[in-house]
Amino acid sequence: MTSTSDAPQDPWHDIRPYQDDEVAATLTRLAEDPELLSALTRYRLPRLSRMTPRLSRTLASWAIKRETRDVTSVTAFQQRIAAYMQRMLKTSTDDFRVDGLDRLDPGTAYLFIGNHRDISLDPAFVNYALYLAGRNTVRIAIGDNLLKKPYVTDLMRLNKSFIVPRSARGKRAMLQAYHKLSSYIRHSIQDDNHSIWMAQREGRAKDGIDRTDPAIIKMMTMAHRADNRHAPLGEGIEALRLVPVSISYEYDPCDVQKARELKAVSEDGSYNKSEFEDISSIVAGITGHKGRVHLRFGTPIDRSFDTPEAVAAEIDRQ
């Protein structure tokens, strides 16, 4: 069992996923969160939520407590999610195929870097593939721009997500935040032997062009370079056991919304999201028809790539 440490011994306490001894308090908090309860009733009980909002929230709270009454660990929570994934696959996909996972050592932690088409499902499909293969699930990198509500933060961190800083102000603050993130990634891979999933770029590829941002590669190796200033970049990459992962969906449930955003950026130069647009995209991605889904795991990138651009190109090639 994992346990919570005080901040000095736990330097990543504010960005890391929740641990087993934090599960019970988090679930209690979620079952009493009025914003979460209102959001659930709007989607599952729309008429009742309009007519008797207090009753609908009470029912939602009771449902959360009933569904999670035996959940006392992160693993148990994810086992519940696996059941929902199975149901989602049956109702919204025609086929789910996985290639390449059998070539990776089940006892080794990897830093999976993947293309990004869906806010929640890209890492969810990676996790489900690992779950079906009897392997440990990944810790998921998620931008703090998605964590605008406390209940969203709780749900994500309960599902083994860690926080990527995007809202830090000022160059110095951003560098400190990214160094902290880089050190956590290294700690997870090398000390905890726990795999990670991270997107190849900031935000989804709304235009369908999957291209790795070299800045992501620089961030990943910051901690290694801080300890070994003259070490080649390839050494840090090899130590992280970086493995490209690609996912493709036959149909994208969010294609209209993505096209609308691209059109606005093209014509107006910017796009302003509505308050709950990301949440709506998550729901649409989960419930919408996806057709055939194909997930492919690549091979670990070795130390022969000596620049962030070269590493990014190899990720894109695979």
Where are the regions that the model predicts?
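Membrane-anchoring hydrophobic helices of lipid-metabolizing enzymes
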Residues: 1-110, 116-127, 131, 153, ...
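Long, compositionally biased intrinsically disordered regions
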Residues: 308-318
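Soluble catalytic domains of membrane acyltransferases
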Residues: 81-306
